[in-house]
Amino acid sequence: MKIAIVGTRGIPNRYGGFERFAEQISSRFADQGHEVTVYCRRAFVRPDDVYDRRVRRVIVPSLHQKHLDTWVSTFFAAVRVAFSNNDVVLLCNVANSPFAYIPRLFGKPVVLNVDGLDRKREKWKGLGAQVLHFCEWMSSFSSTRLVTDAKAIRDYYLAKYGSESTVIGYGSEMPAGDDSLNGFNLEPGRYVLYVSRLEPENNPDLVLRSWRNVRSDWPLVVVGDNPYDRGYIERMKSLGDERVRFTGAIYGDGYWALQKHAGVFVFACEIGGVHPALIEAMAANNAVLYLDTPENAETAGDAGVKYVKSEEDLTAKLQSVLDDPAVRQQLAARAKERADALYRWDVIAGTYEKLFEELIRSRNERLPGKRLQ
């Protein structure tokens, strides 16, 4: 098959979950002999990029501006893919749902992965939230097949729009590579890790305020950035005490080294479906604490310690886990076991592959002379 992946910032990953998804799934498709093209935004591409060279990159214009960047780049990508020889399009992000029609008009099946409920993010207010609500509505019918990454999101689309969807999650295997902590000045197994884009709905302020009340000499390592709001980052830094280390965004071997050697991982995102950072922490054999939302509970279940959105509860849960090495060891083992059983990239890629084949076969049955490649 010839597969196009559209709607992310591109590969290699320098931003977030969809980019990690595109990076991993494209390589798995290439492993199976498929021709894969990832459409990448110009602002996120560098001459020295390291990525799987079996995957073709197509660079499209971008604005690197919060409100229009996604639409501008995806419009150009959708037009280009419409005139390409790709057999199927994997479109990412609910905000891109209006552009599903462009390749569909040219006979290409479009699978839309909507992720979570983006319109609820605090950064989208007023007109922005209304536009995303419109995109959410369009996502319920604009693609050939809708994909949600959690049962909670599937149930939402079914209840609100009457739209069926296929639930396909994410993978979490630890890659091979340099997993040393050289340069971080951290002791393996003796730091708390928080990973997220630094935005209000990811609750870095909750974690930082709670940490001030935890009695421990462990560092809290905050990994993440916000290229669209530097002021918010400065406000978060003002909440940290001398035990907090802000690293900015980290990808590749450095990111995986921090995951692998953390003693505790605290997760505080409340908007979205399945979050890659959470399942990656589980795969890394971490003791996990997570904010109690339906999506997070579906992901981690009893393999982590859940807390409600309050400083008091998070402080108490952190203190309890930090004070008991045996509990940390038990939590880490359960998290790893759950990740290995439920979140494997090869299985995820195979599920998408079968879905693509089904859609292409259905299309070809309506078009005499066509056959599945």
Predicted segments, located by residue:
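A short, well-ordered alpha-helix in the C-terminal region of glycosyltransferases
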Residues: 327-342, 351
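Conserved donor-binding/catalytic core segment of Leloir-type glycosyltransferases
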Residues: 4, 183-215, 221
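Conserved acidic donor-binding segment of nucleotide-sugar-dependent glycosyltransferases
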Residues: 304-312, 320-326
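An aromatic- and histidine-rich active-site surface loop
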Residues: 68-82, 86-115, 273
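Short hydrophobic beta-strand element within catalytic cores of glycosyltransferases
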Residues: 287-290
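Nucleotide-activated donor-binding/catalytic signature segment of Leloir-type glycosyltransferases, i.e.
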Residues: 233-256
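Aromatic "clamp/platform" in nucleotide-sugar-dependent glycosyltransferases that forms part
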Residues: 270
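Membrane-proximal helix-turn-helix segments that form the acceptor-binding/catalytic region
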Residues: 79-82, 105, 128-146
